[in-house]
């Protein structure tokens, strides 16, 4: 949540997302150099995940431009497990306990109630962000299992997504805006980036 707050408080949310994710990419370079890439079995999932993570950054930035953090963040984070659960049941044949059904209903009702608190466009972008979160949750989990090494997997993921997102943001915003964002709050963006990559690594290891 800390890096989401730093992103929301920035003048340009997309550039802030790039800077924060870029910190994770830079921090991952020495790890990648020391350990090397993950096994080839994980590379396909890495390609999928890079695309999803970049889409996530774009959608989240747009959501924060259109609505408040108090709406966008819970909607995005609440939508993701809901979609993962529904997708697991409908597409993968997973079973769900009665208590899980109750949880799905409660989360769905809570998400619907959030529609009245912000703009409809912002709500839609927040839901799309949740879809991307669900997507990379599934693809990264599969990639880690395929490569059997979460640290090497996430090192390559963060380096690649930084490279791709840098190209996208450079074309959309320009180098001047990117440099200005880094100069404006270097310490906060650095701490947010390091916190984000550490938290996500712990999630994948767990």
Task: Locate each region found by the language model.
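Membrane-interface interhelical linkers
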Residues: 1-51, 57-67, 116-127, 159-205
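Juxtamembrane helix-start motifs in multi-pass secondary transporters
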Residues: 16-17, 72, 153
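Hydrophobic core positions of alpha-helical segments in small-molecule transporters
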Residues: 19, 48, 75-76, 99-102, ...
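Structural signature of transmembrane alpha-helices in multi-pass secondary transporters
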Residues: 20, 24, 73-80, 129, ...
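Hydrophobic transmembrane alpha-helices of multi-pass small-molecule transport proteins
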Residues: 22-28, 85-89, 96-115, 131
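Helix-coil boundary and interhelical linker segments in multi-pass alpha-helical membrane proteins
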Residues: 27-44, 87-99, 142-151, 205-206
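Membrane-interface helix-loop-helix junctions at boundaries between adjacent transmembrane segments
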Residues: 60-99, 113
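Selected transmembrane alpha-helices and immediately adjacent juxtamembrane segments
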Residues: 121-145, 149-152
């Amino acid at each position: 949540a800390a890096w989401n707050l730093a992103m929301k408080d920035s003048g340009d949310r997309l550039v802030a997302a790039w800077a924060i994710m870029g910190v994770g990419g830079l921090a991952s370079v020495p790890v990648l150099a020391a350990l090397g890439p993950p096994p080839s079995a994980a590379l396909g999932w890495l390609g999928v995940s890079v695309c999803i993570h970049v889409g996530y950054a774009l959608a989240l930035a747009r959501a924060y431009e259109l609505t408040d953090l108090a709406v966008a963040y819970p909607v995005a984070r609440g939508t993701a497990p809901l979609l993962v659960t529904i997708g697991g049941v409908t597409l993968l044949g997973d079973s769900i306990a009665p208590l899980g059904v109750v949880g799905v209903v409660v989360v769905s009702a809570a998400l619907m109630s959030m529609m009245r608190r912000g703009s409809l466009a912002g709500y839609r972008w927040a839901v799309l962000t949740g879809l991307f979160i669900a997507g990379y949750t599934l693809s990264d989990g599969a990639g880690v299992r395929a490569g059997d090494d979460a640290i090497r997997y996430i090192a390559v993921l963060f380096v690649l997504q930084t490279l791709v997102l840098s190209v996208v943001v450079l074309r959309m915003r320009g180098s001047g805006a990117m440099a200005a964002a880094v100069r404006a709050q270097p310490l906060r963006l650095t701490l947010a980036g390091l916190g984000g990559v550490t938290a996500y690594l712990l999630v994948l290891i767990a």
